[in-house]
Amino acid sequence: MSLLEAVILGLVQGITEFLPISSSAHLILVQALFGMTFAGFSFEILLHLASVLAVILYYRHDLIEIIRGFFAYFTKRTPQNKAMFWFAIYLVVATGITGVAGILFEDYISETFKAPIFIALALAVTGLFLIIIERFVRHGNRTEKEMTIWDSIIVGLGQCLALIPGLSRSGTTLIVGMFAGLTKETAVRFSFLLSIPVILGSSVLAIDDLISGDLLASTGLFELAASFVVTFIASWLGIVFFLNLVRKSKLVYFAVYCFIVAILVFIFQDALGHADI
């Protein structure tokens, strides 16, 4: 893998990871269109770790508040501590549901639905639901203090759908969270914080390669460092950009983008179908 390829893949991963446009679909498409290949599954995981580091630093104050409230609730049961305690529990529940689904079905789903036509359909469905949730569904008014265990179960199940290439993890969790009656801000916050344990959990699968040095030997230290830094910066900017558009009720922009990409994938599906994706 060249330095340019490492930077491009890092840029694509970072920009698309937290936008409701499916990072996995874009990585597959970029590799197929330009003849690029990942240096193994562990390289993809390394890029995800750079993205999750951006989330951790961006939401560091929220994480500290949740952790403090969780443990403080055992000795001081204030309404705020209670809210943070249960918010942490909801994150664990949603993560557990996704983890079980990933272990049982990820290999089958990723292999079955990796064809370009499925990616196009998934992107189109994402765009459709983004329009529905933005224009035709009354936005909820429940914050994290009014969340229930059922919200975490629903969001966790929604996140399982993101195992399908073309369905965005951030998009599905945001959509189902808002359908469940959460405020847009609460749904987005829960979605971003939920990405931390999910991505860290999936990283365990590649820990042997990361520790053994196989990835370093096959890719190169400079290329790995460059892709990691680029992914981190792009992820941070992606978070800021997404939150800004969410506050301005501009999810329809992402819907239009999903439709455009879906059409392009459909048009060029024969060329993509012959690529090793």
From Swiss-Prot:
Q: Which GO terms describe its cellular component?
A: plasma membrane
| Remaining remarks | Bacitracin is thought to be involved in the inhibition of peptidoglycan synthesis by sequestering undecaprenyl diphosphate, thereby reducing the pool of lipid carrier available.
Q: What enzyme category does the UniProt record give?
A: hydrolase
Membrane topology term: Multi-pass membrane protein
| GO MF entries | undecaprenyl-diphosphatase activity
Q: Which InterPro entries match?
A: UppP (IPR003824)
Question: Which keywords, in A-to-Z order, does the entry hold?
Answer: Antibiotic resistance, Cell membrane, Cell shape, Cell wall biogenesis/degradation, Hydrolase, Membrane, Peptidoglycan synthesis, Transmembrane, Transmembrane helix
Reactions mediated catalytically: di-trans,octa-cis-undecaprenyl diphosphate + H2O = di-trans,octa-cis-undecaprenyl phosphate + phosphate + H(+)
Protein name (Swiss-Prot/TrEMBL): Undecaprenyl-diphosphatase 1
Q: Which family does it belong to?
A: Belongs to the UppP family.
Q: Which GO terms describe its biological process?
A: cell wall organization; peptidoglycan biosynthetic process; regulation of cell shape; response to antibiotic
Q: Where does it live in the cell?
A: Cell membrane
- Name the EC number(s): 3.6.1.27
Residues spanning the membrane: 1-21, 39-58, 85-105, 113-133, 147-167, 191-211, 226-246, 251-271
UniProt source species:
Shouchella clausii (strain KSM-K16)
Look up keyword Cell membrane and say if it applies. Answer: yes
